[in-house]
Each structure stands twice: as C-alpha cells, then as structure tokens.
Amino acid sequence: MNLLDPILLESKPLLFLSFLTAIVSAVHRHGSLLRASIASSGNDHRLGGNEAPPAIISVYLGEGLEKLLEAVENQREYTYIAESMRDLQIPTLPHLLLDTLDRNRTSPFVFTGNKFEFRSVGASAHPGKAVTVLNAIVANL
C-alpha cells in the first residue's frame, strides 16, 4: 500500500493526510539538515544559480493538495480532484487531462502524484545521505 497515494483520500483520508503532513512538517522544521545532506562545492554552485531548483528547501504539493490542506486547516469542506479535464470544444478531439505537477522544476521537494521527489541531490552525488536524513527527520516527529 502506497501511503502517499491520493486515492486513499476516498477510503482512508486520515491515513493519507497524516503521512503527507508529517513529511511536509519534517521538511519545514529540519530543512537545514536536509540542505546540509546535499551540500558540496559543485552542488552549492549549481543550486539557485542559472539552474533550478533553488538552494532554499521548499515543498510544492500542487494546487489541489494545497487547497485540500487549507480547507482542513480552516475546517471547510473540500473535494480533492487529482486531475482536471479540459474540453477543447472540438468534437473530433478527446478531452485532455491537465497535468497539475511542477513541470518547470522550480521546487526542490515536490509531490508528484503519489510520491515526493527530492530534486536537489547533485548528479554525481549518492542519494543515500539525503534519504537517511529525510527518514530521520520524518521519524523524529
């Protein structure tokens, strides 16, 4: 079972929201540790320069999940829709599925459908240190 699959919102919404908010909270509280886990001279030069993502660790959830969390915070009703359809008003063409993901890659920590991507690890670096730190900061909550 993927605990970060938004399909859980239908059957087990508290389970999904618990894991999602735990990860977001951990990155918010311990972003500096996560940033230190990917630090190297080459990566520090790359991040925030002429290339995305920036050196500041931020989380991008997408518009749908952002609205859902705001509704939970404000105790309002909200129905999460994972994807949207666009009708081009051309009878011979099907409806298009709109992508709500971060395509321009401007955030270093992104929710992409049913998982998080940490995009700040350098190409030549081993992701093990960052994954270990991420697991530790989430477990620390």
Please report, for each region that a protein language model flagged, where it lies by residue.
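Active-site capping/gating regions of soluble enzymes
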Residues: 1-141
